[in-house]
Amino acid sequence: MRNCVMGSIAALATVLVFPAVPFAQAAQQPGMTKADAQSKAFDAHDFAGIWNPAPRMQPKGEVNPLDLGGHPNPLPPFAPAGQAKYESNKKFIDAGAVLDCDPYGTARNFFTPRPFENIQARDRLLQHFEYYDNWREIWMDGRNFPDDLEPDYMGYSIGRWEGETFVVDSRGYNGKQFLTWQGFPLSESMRQTERWQRMDHDTLKIVFTFEDPKMYSKPWTITYFYKLMSNWVLDAHPCTLAAIKEYDERINHADHLPGRDYKPEK
């Protein structure tokens, strides 16, 4: 059973406004040492199971949404439009107006301190993200991107194998979400590439590359590590109108939060 449970809307607000709280709760699996994980046999082509971000393993010195310990992290290479959008998004987040029921999108789901489950089938890999109950399909049947691709929050993803590396190409985003909780923007032009490698029995490494010439002056990369949580199950964290109403009453209408009526620029 999961040992990291959000028990109230107040806790939800803490995650959204002060996301560092849950990070210390990510732990090694009970009874499994690092040496055990490295020596235990595994299939490099098997990503099935529940995975959780491993904040203490994330590389330093690069853009890293999980590194919230007071370390100054570099920002991505914004284009002028991206810099302006980021500043607008940041004001929106600082004002506390960050809760809605829109899907997080693929990138932000990966960079949220909540687990996700991979379910592998013959022709696709399904991902179930715990937070907001978001789902993603990665097609593995050799198809190409549709000519009439409809923009969507989660995009359209196609995967292929390069040896023991699983390469995922995603496009078709609608540009309505953030890449990260800090408000890094994206547009409908964004292309997201992921390179998955299972490093040992318990460790999954994913290198994310973002190409979006409207928002960024050049492609940029984030490397993330995830730990296999064999004894966990996903909790239910759907977004509901009741949750938004309570969040708004407790947080957005609080006198100590400036700019609670602030709306982001379109």
Please report, for each region that a protein language model flagged, where it lies by residue:
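Hydrophobic core
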Residues: L12-F18
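PEST-like low-complexity, intrinsically disordered acidic/proline/serine-rich tracts
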Residues: N3-V5, I9, A20-K266
